[in-house]
């Protein structure tokens, strides 16, 4: 039986497979990785009846152009994305996000670009035919960990999919509410007291701009310098996703999914889990303001965030 696959006609800027991530490996220097926007990743799987942790393609800015070979499949794209479906009969459909589509052998999907955002997700019913590495499908290109030899997909590659008897699903879609907020909530970092009162006032009152020097490892911010009154270099300590480090130049860096497991810069704050998807989707040039919240409130906001994701998933069902 011929294997089913997606042929990469254009790889896009950074197309990889991601899931919820790999965990409990920090002690050997392996970070969690995983989808940058977990809510949209999970919803993409829900739209095609997959397990919510099934591997999906994640792309940034410009996505891939893919041709389906030897299969008929149900697919879904989530995010704020421009994309077209090029049918083998030469007709073209303008795609709608958060909606399932049925692709037939020979159809192409052209993921043109993200809109006022960074990441999008492409899920196929049944998932991709690849092995987990360290119990996860996630690819970390910096560490070369994960399927596809830890690398992003390239021109001409075949991305194999699990082939099964696939029938066209009843159309599934949801009305997703996009909120373009620039207020990012944080809790105090472990080195909060390393910074002057003036620096703390600046951090919470002034606006920062997302730099072009941002990727899956971290987001650099441009803005007023933060004065460190203790030491700009400390003994390396463990890092977590969302922690905000301040190096010697005084400009904050938010650590993302592919962050190193340890770091030697003071940590002024940590983005709360409820706001992580939101901050990850801010493109270069976006403005950010930070707001301090208590740990108890951060936990409650996260519960609300999870409930909101589950609400969308129930709407799909």
Range-by-range predicted roles:
Residues 1-317:
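Conserved "landmark" site that anchors the functional core of diverse proteins
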């Amino acid at each position: 039986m011929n294997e089913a696959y997606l042929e990469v006609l254009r790889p896009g800027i950074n197309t990889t497979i991601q899931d919820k991530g790999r965990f409990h490996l920090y002690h050997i220097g392996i970070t969690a990785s995983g989808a940058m926007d977990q809510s949209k990743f999970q919803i993409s799987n829900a739209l095609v009846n997959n397990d919510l942790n099934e591997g999906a393609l994640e792309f940034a800015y410009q996505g891939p152009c893919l041709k389906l070979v030897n299969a008929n499949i149900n697919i879904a794209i989530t995010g704020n994305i421009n994309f077209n479906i090029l049918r083998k009969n030469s007709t073209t459909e303008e795609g709608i996000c958060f909606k399932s589509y049925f692709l037939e052998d020979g159809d192409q999907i052209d993921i043109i670009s993200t809109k006022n955002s960074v990441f999008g997700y492409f899920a196929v019913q049944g998932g991709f035919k690849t092995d987990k590495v360290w119990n996860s499908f996630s690819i970390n290109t910096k560490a070369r960990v994960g399927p596809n030899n830890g690398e992003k997909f390239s021109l001409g590659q075949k991305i194999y999919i699990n082939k099964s008897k696939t029938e066209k699903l009843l159309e599934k879609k949801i009305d997703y509410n996009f909120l373009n907020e620039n207020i990012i909530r944080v809790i105090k970092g472990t080195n909060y007291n390393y910074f002057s009162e003036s620096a703390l006032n600046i951090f919470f009152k002034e606006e920062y701009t997302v730099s072009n020097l941002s990727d899956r490892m971290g987001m650099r911010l441009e803005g007023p310098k933060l004065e460190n009154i203790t030491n700009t270099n400390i003994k390396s300590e463990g890092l977590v996703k969302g922690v905000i480090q301040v190096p010697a130049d005084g400009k904050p860096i938010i650590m993302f999914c592919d962050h190193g497991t340890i770091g030697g810069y003071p940590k002024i704050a940590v983005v709360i889990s409820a706001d992580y998807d939101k901050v990850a989707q801010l493109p270069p040039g976006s403005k950010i303001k930070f707001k301090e919240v208590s740990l108890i409130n951060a936990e409650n906001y996260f519960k609300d965030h999870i409930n909101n994701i589950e609400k969308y998933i129930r709407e799909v069902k």
